[in-house]
């Protein structure tokens, strides 16, 4: 059964070639949304689009590196040129190269800031004028439980980026509510995705794999995103924290 409040919504999703982004794209498309997908892996995006459309869904795909502002702008432009509007953006792209601060993985710090913070801001910058002109829209940003409690040792910079996502989203909400634009933070715990492979250190990847044995499937997060989207226009879900029942962190 299709959910009427999701059907026909135009939804842009970054990081949509796997994990949370892919699961969200598939779920929303199955419920009648017109999904516009961006990710670095063009071959994978094309495969997801092909599978969605083969099932009767509406999907477009664009090669999108969120660290490149012009590519994020092209993703949003592609959505508006095809559909004439954007109802929702899910800023999902993120990386988690865990390492102790003393390891001085400065390049990885830079990369996390570029993807997790600046990439999200590029998504907001691209879509906000469209939504303000429409006088409606919904910006959904993926944070983490690490945005509530610093994940240390090892995840200090990652946690900092997710604290930033929560602060940026709440501040944005206060600024754009007059334009009838909703803002939602989704803060997952351990989810079975490729995120655990972000670290450059094999020992850390091994520990993460062990820790993530209790991880929940990505469609759990997709359902939370769908729940936020399907609310009436006057109802805003500010934040959803979702994690494995067994997870203490």
Per-range role (PLM):
Residues 181, 185-186, 206-249:
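C-terminal helical subdomain
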Residues 33-47:
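Conserved glycine-rich Rossmann-like NAD(P)H-binding loop of the short-chain dehydrogenase/reductase
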Residues 100-101, 108-113:
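Substrate-binding pocket helix/loop in short-chain dehydrogenase/reductase
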Residues 17-18:
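Conserved glycine-rich cofactor-binding loop
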Residues 124, 161:
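Active-site helix of classical SDR
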């Amino acid at each position: 059964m299709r959910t009427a409040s999701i059907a026909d919504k135009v939804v842009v999703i970054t990081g949509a070639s796997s994990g949370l982004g892919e699961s969200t794209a598939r779920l929303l498309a199955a419920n009648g949304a017109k999904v516009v997908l961006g990710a670095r892996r063009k071959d994978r995006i094309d495969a997801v689009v092909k599978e969605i459309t083969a099932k009767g869904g509406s999907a477009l795909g664009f090669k999108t590196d969120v660290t490149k502002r012009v590519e994020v702008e092209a993703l949003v432009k592609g959505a508006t040129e095809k559909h004439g509007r954007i109802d929702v953006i899910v800023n999902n792209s993120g990386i988690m190269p865990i390492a102790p601060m003393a390891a001085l993985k400065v390049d990885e710090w830079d990369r996390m800031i570029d993807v997790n913070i600046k990439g999200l801001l590029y998504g907001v910058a691209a879509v906000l004028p469209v939504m303000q002109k429409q006088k409606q829209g919904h910006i959904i940003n993926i944070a983490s439980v690490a945005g509530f409690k610093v994940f240390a040792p090892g995840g200090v910079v990652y946690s900092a980026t997710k604290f930033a996502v929560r602060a940026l989203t709440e501040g944005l909400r206060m600024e754009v509510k007059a334009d009838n634009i909703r803002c939602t933070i989704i803060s997952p715990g351990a989810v079975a995705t490729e995120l655990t492979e972000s670290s450059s250190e094999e020992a850390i990847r091994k520990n993460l794999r062990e820790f993530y044995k209790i991880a929940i499937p990505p469609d759990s997060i997709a359902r939370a995103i769908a729940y936020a989207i399907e609310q009436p226009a006057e109802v805003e879900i500010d934040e959803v924290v979702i994690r494995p029942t067994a997870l203490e962190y």
